[in-house]
Amino acid sequence: MLCLAGAAFISCVGTAPTKEVHLVDSLNQVAYTYRYKNLDSSYHAASKAYQEVGLYSQGKAEACNNLGFCAFMRMDFEEAEKYYQTVYNLTKNELELLVADIGLMKIYQRTALNKEFYDYRNSALRRMKRIAED
């Protein structure tokens, strides 16, 4: 009996609690909903989602994409780049990575970093192809 309990405990290590997932997902949804309506509200919700993450790295990646968008809209390209780059260390989710690719493309287009723009454009195209295959 002790072995089974130990095995069950080990299999759950690293899994985000349901309550955390629901909270972070709802905050990210609010951030996304307000992105073109009220940028401050979008930023506040995304920032709260980022802070509330314990184990839910997927939710943190989405929060980073939302924070990157807010920073981009404020024309704080360095901050936006930092958030988008963070996504690559948090998740393997192709959709979140695609959002980060496109966010970085927008930054590099605006800042005339053409090589970087095309690097992330090619990454986004490959990612879209993989997503379409799935």
Regions of interest found by a model, annotated:
Residues 9-134:
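A "functional boundary" signal
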Residues 1-8:
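Bacterial N-terminal signal peptides
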